[in-house]
Amino acid sequence: MIGGLFVYNHKGEVLISRIYRDDVTRNAVDAFRVNVIHARQQVRSPVTNMARTSFFHVKRGNVWICAVTRQNVNAAMVFEFLKRFADTMQSYFGKLNEENVKNNFVLIYELLDEILDFGYPQNTDPGVLKTFITQQGVRTADAPVPVTKEEQSQITSQVTGQIGWRREGIKYRRNELFLDVIEYVNLLMNQQGQVLSAHVAGKVAMKSYLSGMPECKFGINDKITIEGKSKPGSDDPNKASRAAVAIDDCQFHQCVKLTKFETEHAISFIPPDGEYELMRYRTTKDIQLPFRVIPLVREVSRNKMEVKVVVKSNFKPSLLAQKLEVRIPTPPNTSGVQLICMKGKAKYKAGENAIVWKIKRMAGMKESQISAEIDLLSTGNVEKKKWNRPPVSMNFEVPFAPSGLKVRYLKVFEPKLNYSDHDVIKWVRYIGRSGLYETRC
């Protein structure tokens, strides 16, 4: 539980202060200001412990948000709450800065009354909060529109009921559902082409514009394994092996019915309205690496070095990768670079000690290469200290999920309103992007 919550500006002045427990005093305000905000050296850790008191902080622009506690709390829970608190404020009055916090301090205190109860986080969904807290960023002199008994009953049932993330009575002229599978590939490969570490961090992002109170359901691969638990969906071992995905860990939105996921390996949920993140997951097995980077470095003499980098695409020829960028490090004593590339454009950036090679598009099962002749300056200091070659890094975007995650079906059920699954316009998109994608040279 959280003992106190404070919001500071960049000078360390307190903009918002709320103490929830007696074991936290106003002295905590000064302790954080002196030891973190006004510290001589930048404090990199988001958690600071002083006098048996823990300070958890995040920074948005020029605003510091700090949660204080003397209890042994779950750090992940505190940071998740701080993130959602900041997102909630942004959803009400836009950019989170000192001026907006001062202009909306009444609204912020009203939000704190709803999202924290005696230090325990409660409802932090902006969509739900906006049903019973004014949406105006700054309070006006005009009295708010009174809430009827019927509206009050609807608000109460939404906040305390089982479906607190969606209000009733939503109507759209056209029912649409968008699903994006977005994955980030992280790779570290040595000079011989051996994978030292690789993992995929993925998420399922959705946009729902559906009328009424529908139930959505989508199925993923024929076979999925989560933390050693196999959920078979096919009796054919060959088919299951081709479609299998081993997920190390995953996290779902509160709307997902976990019991059905355990039994049917299908995700069933009543969706929130608008944009939301339905699922996060991580996998380290059977990753399809979109690209192979092969660097070759040859030291011709003390004053010259030759570099050749080959990029090979490892996916279907019908697919097209975009936004390719390869960064090739150069020694700090580089005086000049001559470049020859088969495709795209390459440029030497002296300020970054790197050659940046950009390719707009590249089809699958293709390869391209770049050659560079690097001229070096002869300096005693550089010759004495050997240059440790940084890895070659790569950025890209591909239209498939490198983990192999597939959406088998996506259905919508709404028994009360007069529309069926066939009346809903549905879109499914796969996006694979580079995280930290490096090859040692």
Swiss-Prot record:
UniProt note: phenotype after gene disruption: Mutants display a squat body statue referred to as a dumpy phenotype and have defective HSN neuronal cell migration. AWB sensory neurons show an expanded ciliary membrane phenotype with enhanced wing cilia and relocalized tub-1 and PtdIns(4,5)P2 to the ciliary base. RNAi-mediated knockdown results in impaired function of the AP-2 complex and accumulation of the wntless homolog mig-14 at the cell membrane.
Membrane topology of this protein: Peripheral membrane protein
Keyword terms, alphabetized: Cell membrane, Coated pit, Endocytosis, Membrane, Protein transport, Transport
Record CDD domains: AP-2_Mu2_Cterm (cd09251), AP2_Mu_N (cd14836)
Entries under PROSITE patterns matching the protein: CLAT_ADAPTOR_M_1, CLAT_ADAPTOR_M_2, MHD
Molecular function as annotated in GO: clathrin adaptor activity
GO cellular component, as recorded: AP-2 adaptor complex; cytoplasmic vesicle; periciliary membrane compartment; synapse; synaptic vesicle
Keyword flag Cell inner membrane: no
Gene3D superfamilies the UniProt entry points to: 3.30.450.60, Mu homology domain, subdomain B
Name this polypeptide is given: AP-2 complex subunit mu
Organism: Caenorhabditis elegans
Phylogenetic lineage: Eukaryota, Metazoa, Ecdysozoa, Nematoda, Chromadorea
